[in-house]
């Protein structure tokens, strides 16, 4: 590995991608941007290429590639433009890359994230859907390739920091009783249940504590985000669903906790800023400045905790059930949720319909065994088709 680490940022124009580039720019002596990818914000992607001068940039189609390549040449930049999933996999597994930030949202991030894992890279995992969809296959690839997998979700990063280094021996073996996964409760934590039928995409995207993209903001409002994180935590830390308890913590200061059999509870605290887990994972096992302000406990004053209400947040229940069933159920849950959230953002369904659509899809057929990646994508395809049927009837 060279002194300056070469970083590929998949999903560079999103919230996580931009935060990653902010941290990288603070440490030019340690990190350089090897490749960037973007999907729809091509003007922003061009600006990032000018700022960071990557070797490669990946865009979704030939038309976007032609336009961007022309702009980059006009700016006298040597950056080469690649296209589509093949391009994403190429920059994720490239021989000169040391570390990959996997921050593409949704199922689209699975193949390039797996490409990074199979190439044995240090993978900073922000794409939770990769593990939700293909958990057993994904973790098997990590073990076989020798890749280093570091979680970026603030909750999983917190759990990682609170566990001993040898937690791979098993949670019981290292004395863990349970993992406490914190959740803010989102913008609808106290909204009267009857009003949830009428909330708008703008209200759902107005998170009280975190700055996030639209899809993850809606997932946070429905608490599907926490459900997906529960499934992800099961795979990352080899935990059973019943070992993970979700706790509403409205201040988003404690990012998660680990409860040990001797009565000790370790927690990781910090301001709600994704640059903290990003900097932790980039530098691990060392520490670097992230640009995040120090935590002011006196300004916070108090920390509150409550149990989640599954009547208010049925998506959390559906995710836990999918985790318990296993097989293709988590992939179908994720696909149905992606369709439902997109329909809600387009104002085609109500917020409360998100859980209804997902439950319909999960009840429409029994979960199947998932022994190869093709089975994962088939489950994803079936779930999207079923979700489309539900949409057509409502």
Swiss-Prot record:
Keywords: Isoprene biosynthesis, Manganese, Metal-binding, NADP, Oxidoreductase. It is an enzyme of class 1 (oxidoreductase). It comes from the Bacteria. NADPH binds at residues 13-16, 127, 129, 213. Its cofactor is Mg(2+); Mn(2+). Pathway: Isoprenoid biosynthesis; isopentenyl diphosphate biosynthesis via DXP pathway; isopentenyl diphosphate from 1-deoxy-D-xylulose 5-phosphate: step 1/6. Mn(2+) binds at residues 153, 155, 229. GO terms for molecular function: 1-deoxy-D-xylulose-5-phosphate reductoisomerase activity; manganese ion binding; NADPH binding. 1-deoxy-D-xylulose 5-phosphate binds at residues 128, 154-155, 184, 207, 220, 225-226, 229. Catalyzes the NADPH-dependent rearrangement and reduction of 1-deoxy-D-xylulose-5-phosphate (DXP) to 2-C-methyl-D-erythritol 4-phosphate (MEP). Belongs to the DXR family. This is 1-deoxy-D-xylulose 5-phosphate reductoisomerase. It comes from Ectopseudomonas mendocina (strain ymp) (Pseudomonas mendocina).
């Amino acid at each position: 590995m060279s002194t300056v680490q070469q970083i590929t940022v998949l999903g560079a124009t999103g919230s996580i991608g931009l935060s990653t580039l902010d941290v990288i720019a603070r440490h030019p002596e340690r990190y350089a941007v090897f490749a960037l990818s973007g999907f729809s914000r091509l003007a922003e992607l061009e600006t990032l290429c000018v700022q960071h001068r990557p070797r490669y940039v990946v865009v979704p189609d030939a038309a976007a590639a032609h336009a961007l390549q022309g702009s980059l040449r006009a700016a006298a930049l040597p950056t080469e433009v690649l296209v589509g999933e093949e391009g994403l996999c190429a920059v994720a597994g490239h021989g000169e890359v040391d570390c990959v930030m996997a921050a593409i949202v949704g199922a689209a991030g699975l193949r390039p994230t797996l490409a990074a894992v199979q190439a044995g890279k240090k993978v900073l995992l922000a794409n939770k859907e990769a593990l939700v969809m293909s958990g057993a296959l994904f973790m098997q690839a990590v073990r076989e390739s020798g890749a280093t997998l570091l979680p970026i979700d603030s909750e999983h990063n917190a759990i990682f920091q609170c566990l001993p280094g040898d937690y791979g021996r098993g949670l019981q073996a290292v004395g863990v009783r349970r993992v406490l996964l914190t959740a803010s409760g989102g913008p609808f934590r106290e909204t009267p249940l009857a009003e949830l039928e009428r909330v708008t995409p703008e209200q759902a995207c107005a998170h009280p504590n975190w700055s996030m993209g639209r899809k993850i903001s809606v997932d946070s409002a429905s608490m599907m985000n926490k459900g997906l994180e529960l499934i992800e935590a099961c795979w990352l830390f080899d935990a059973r669903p019943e070992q993970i308890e979700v706790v509403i913590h409205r201040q988003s200061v404690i990012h998660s906790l680990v409860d040990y059999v001797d009565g000790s509870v370790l927690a990781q605290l910090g301001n709600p800023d994704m640059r903290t887990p990003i900097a932790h994972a980039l530098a691990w096992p060392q520490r670097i400045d992230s640009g995040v302000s120090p935590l002011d406990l006196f300004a916070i004053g108090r920390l509150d905790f409550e149990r989640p209400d599954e009547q208010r947040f049925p998506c959390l229940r559906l995710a836990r059930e999918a985790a318990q069933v296993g097989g293709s159920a988590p992939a179908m849950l994720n696909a149905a949720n992606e369709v439902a959230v997109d329909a809600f953002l387009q104002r085609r369904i109500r917020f409360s319909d998100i859980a209804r659509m997902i439950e319909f899809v999960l009840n429409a057929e029994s979960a199947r065994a998932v022994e190869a990646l093709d089975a994962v994508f088939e489950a994803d395809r079936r779930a999207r088709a079923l979700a489309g049927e539900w949409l057509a009837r409502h």
